[in-house]
From Swiss-Prot:
Membrane-protein topology: Multi-pass membrane protein
Protein name: High-affinity choline transporter 1
Subcellular location: Membrane
GO BP terms: acetylcholine biosynthetic process; amino acid transmembrane transport; choline transport
Source species: Drosophila melanogaster (Fruit fly)
Assigned keywords, A-Z: Glycoprotein, Ion transport, Membrane, Neurotransmitter biosynthesis, Sodium, Sodium transport, Symport, Transmembrane, Transmembrane helix, Transport
Entry superkingdom: Eukaryota
Glycosylation sites: 289
Length: 614
């Protein structure tokens, strides 16, 4: 029977999210459809909204439904994701937020494409895309499960309907809409779930959590210790190289603020996990055959994935479930747009523009991104319909990102000079091969290699092969890069063998971004006839390759626009002059000023100086 109150609550909360999303989308500068404006909200996200949207990086439909499901099926000990993703925000803030934001990148793939080339960056886009699709699929599956409980709709129908609504909503705007709906989303989750907990806990059918038969804590068997560590490391470090995270980092006004938001959001992740943990424990203490629930008991995998909406539906009064179910549904819906936008942004910029259409206009890129939003939404829908467990889907989404992307992102951010395209491709192949060799029970992939401790009964690998794949990928990246560099630079391999043109056979028109300038907020390099800059405040002009004035790289001080522009121009001129001096091999004389000395010490008369700018 259809729950009228539940349907009304969903409609009202959806309208709230939709109105906020449309209102936030109007904050975009009129007529400004640039990549930064749509993908990064003009790098103008403030502290209050930033805290909420950074927390919502992980806190969404999959987070709350998956946490409750894990508590019910395996216990608190095995509910690693809230703690793992919280730590990933901490480590991301310490090691990645500051350098990534200082260099003014637009997507997470920018530094990878910078170091390894456009086509290798396109290859690295694939695991990033898989991760975003898996995550969005988990969100849609959670929403479909919620709707099937509330209005008694078939699960498949509800997933398809939910994805259509999410895609439609995402097309309304870029990061402005995503960020401001995140504020509503977290308020809905926090207030809606906490309102339901006292009523569910006091329900007459709920037993005592201290009962020995109600094991909501769980335990780790000795044979699963390495598996437990493997999953923990996967969540912590596999939670860093995600565009949904760096989208928030790169949209912050300053690098310092990006770090601060990461730390505060980590605490927010733990705080927001408390309500679903309690709801999962309440569900564990409930004999469901004594309630109004009419499904199979003990609960099957299909039912356990819906455990949170089931608690709200069957253990709370109608007027309470009105808020709880509606709030959860709206929260799930608003979190779907973030992953879809992230994947579409990376495709439009790092694949379509930088590989196929380097001279594409900004409006063309925006339209490509909108089409990509629809395609990514369809892929996520297919995944949501084919994988039964939300928590399994949620955990699996970090696998490829962890073993492939994390080692490569670590190297290009902190050790760029010690890696090249040969090492990147080799590491990619090694990581993918080892990960696939372990199989995947959720996808029905049989293992090619049964590592030590393999459980024949559960078809599960107890050996930490994911972490092994990540470490071997890192070692391969470093060693192959070192070997190829040594072979080419020593002359043992002729330059013509440098097929990737990344060691000695580098053409003049290849674009590379170097180290940040002394100002710490600028990044541009003259390479051949073109200058490339990722959002850096260098030479004025609308085209990105000529540099675009970027208000995000201003300090937190409210400088007048004219003053900020003057500082940017002076810094850019100083950079260009320094690079030209280095290129011509001249340096100022230390003796009397008025002469320039060549590196051989020969005096040269200076040209008459004029006052015109570059």
């Amino acid at each position: 029977m259809i729950n009228i109150a539940g349907v009304v609550s969903i409609v009202l909360f959806y309208l709230l999210i939709l109105v906020v999303g449309i209102w936030a989308g109007r904050k975009k500068q009129s007529g400004n459809d640039s990549e930064e404006e749509v993908m990064l909200a003009g790098r103008s996200i403030g502290l209050f909204v930033g805290i909420f949207t950074m927390t919502a990086t992980w806190v969404g439909g999959g987070y709350i439904n998956g946490t409750a499901e894990a508590i019910y099926t395996s216990g608190l000990v095995w509910c690693q994701a809230p703690f793992g993703y919280a730590l990933s925000l901490v480590f991301g803030g310490i090691f990645f937020a500051n350098p990534m934001r200082k260099q003014g990148y637009i997507t997470m793939l920018d530094p990878l494409q910078d170091s390894f080339g456009e086509r290798m960056g396109g290859l690295l886009f694939l695991p990033a895309l898989c991760g975003e699709v898996f995550w969005a699929a988990g969100i849609l599956a959670a929403l479909g499960a919620t709707l099937s409980v509330i209005i008694d709709m078939d699960h498949r129908t509800s997933v398809i309907l939910s994805s259509c609504i999410a895609i439609f909503y995402t097309l309304f705007g870029g990061l402005y809409s995503v960020a401001y709906t995140d504020v509503i989303q977290l308020f809905c989750i926090f207030i809606g779930l906490w309102m339901c907990i006292p009523f569910a806990w006091s329900n007459e059918h709920v037993g005592s959590l201290s009962d020995l038969e109600v094991d909501w804590i769980g335990h780790v068997e000795p044979k699963k210790h390495w598996l437990y560590i493997d999953y923990g490391l996967l969540l912590v470090f596999g939670g860093i190289p995600w565009q949904v995270y760096f989208q928030r980092v790169l949209s912050s006004k300053t690098a310092g603020r990006a770090q601060l938001l990461s730390y505060v959001a980590a605490a927010g992740c733990i705080l927001m996990a408390i309500p679903p943990v309690l709801i999962g424990a309440i569900a564990k203490a409930t004999p469901w055959n004594e309630t109004d629930y009419k499904g199979p008991y003990p609960l099957t995998v299909d039912e356990t994935s819906m455990i949170l909406p089931m608690v709200l539906q069957y253990l709370t009064p109608d007027f309470v479930s009105f808020f709880g179910l509606g709030a959860v549904s709206a929260a799930v819906m608003s979190s779907a747009d973030s992953s879809v936008l992230s994947a579409a942004s990376m495709f439009a910029r790092n694949v379509y523009k930088l590989i196929f259409r380097q001279k594409a206009s900004e409006m063309e890129i925006i339209w490509v991104m909108r089409v990509a939003i629809i395609v990514v939404g369809i892929l996520a829908t297919i995944m949501a319909l084919t994988i039964p467990s939300i928590y399994g889907l949620w955990s699996m989404c970090s696998d490829l990102v962890y073993v492939i992307l994390f080692p490569q992102l670590l190297m290009v951010v902190h050790f760029k000079k010690h890696c090249n395209t040969y090492g990147s491709l080799s590491a990619y192949i090694v990581a993918l091969a080892i990960r696939l060799s372990g199989g995947e029970a959720i996808l029905g992939l049989a293992p090619l290699i049964k590592y030590p401790g393999y459980d024949e009964e559960t078809k599960e690998q107890m050996f930490p092969f994911r972490t092994m794949a990540m470490l071997l990928s890192l070692v391969t990246l470093i060693s192959v890069s070192w070997w190829t560099k040594m072979m080419f630079e020593s002359g043992k391999l002729p330059p013509s063998y440098d097929y990737f043109r990344c060691v000695v056979n580098i053409p003049e028109d290849v674009q590379r971004v170097g180290d940040p300038s002394e100002s710490g907020e600028q990044l541009s390099v003259m390479a051949g006839p073109l200058a490339r800059s990722y959002g850096a405040a260098t030479m004025a002009g609308k085209d990105e390759r000529n540099g675009r004035i970027n208000p995000a790289l201003e300090s937190d001080d409210d400088l007048p626009v004219a003053e900020a522009r003057r500082i940017n121009q002076e810094t850019a001129q100083a950079q260009v002059k320094k690079m030209l001096d280095n290129a011509t091999g001249v340096k100022p004389s230390g003796g009397g000023g008025g002469h320039l000395q060549s590196q051989s010490g020969m005096a040269m008369p200076t040209a008459e100086q004029d006052n015109t700018a570059f």
